[in-house]
Amino acid sequence: MKPVVLTFLALVMSARAVATQRPPASATRPPFTIVVNNANPVDTLTVAELRRIFMKQQRLWAHGDTIVPVDWDAASQMRRVFSQIILSRSVREMAEYWVQQSVTQGLAPPSTLSSGVAVARFVATVPGAIAYLPPDAADRSVKRVRIDGLPVFPAQSR
């Protein structure tokens, strides 16, 4: 009986030690970075706010500017990942959402661009713009925004 209890305690302690270890920085890095125009005072957004913004349920920034979300082309991997993680929908489900919004609310989907350079250039020149970029594509022409509530992602193998 005593060896069973000791084995159980050892397992519990090992599990606790593993659970309290922080994952390496690469494991927590999201597959995209949210960016806004440098003049935008926003520093942090929640996943729920991003969802409302990219589904055009929130159309104004707190400081009064119109929000201009920019998406990637529907065929891009960036768009698929962003849609799944932030919008909790596939690209196809989002296309269906926009058909419904167009008919019932008169809303058009966000504009789409096909490259990180084009997305960054657009965000840098449009005051209310918001978009997502690969983490290494966000340069000083745009402002990175912290995402509160984003889940931890495993490191990607290269």
Feature-to-residue mapping (PLM):
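Bacterial N-terminal signal peptides
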Residues: 5-14
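Sec/Tat signal peptide C-region and signal peptidase I cleavage site
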Residues: 16-19
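Exported/periplasmic ABC-transporter solute-binding proteins
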Residues: 21-158
